[in-house]
């Protein structure tokens, strides 16, 4: 069974962005990975820019994205951007996510949905 999740982040320049991730959203994996590998602002920005993902790896290059997969349109999998972190995450929500992980520019937080 998939543990679906969101990543919502405050980006460089103050904007906020959000993506959906399909697998491995349980805190023992997702929060640990984000805290270990995505605490550099530039890397967090790059993660959001990938768009929706199947899974997130410990390096950007290891993220399995939906982009480029047959039948996937960028319009459907692109990040949602805006000025308010919670509002961006709420707009991007698919409805079946179990967790939301947020980056405020300093640290990661987890919310069970």
Q: Each predicted region: which residue ranges?
A:
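Short, extreme N-terminal segment that most often corresponds to the first beta-strand
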Residues: 1-26
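Compact beta-rich and alpha/beta scaffold cores in large eukaryotic transport/transcription complexes
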Residues: 17-42
């Amino acid at each position: 069974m998939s543990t679906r999740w969101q990543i919502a982040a405050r980006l460089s320049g103050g904007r906020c962005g959000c993506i959906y991730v399909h697998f491995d959203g349980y805190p023992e994996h997702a929060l640990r990975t984000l805290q270990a590998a995505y605490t550099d602002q530039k890397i967090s920005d790059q993660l959001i820019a990938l768009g929706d993902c199947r899974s997130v790896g410990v390096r950007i290059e290891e993220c399995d994205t939906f982009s480029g997969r047959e039948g996937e349109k960028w319009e459907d999998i692109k990040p949602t951007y805006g000025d308010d972190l919670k509002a961006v995450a709420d707009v991007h929500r698919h409805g079946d996510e179990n967790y939301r992980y947020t980056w405020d520019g300093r640290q990661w937080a987890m919310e069970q949905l």
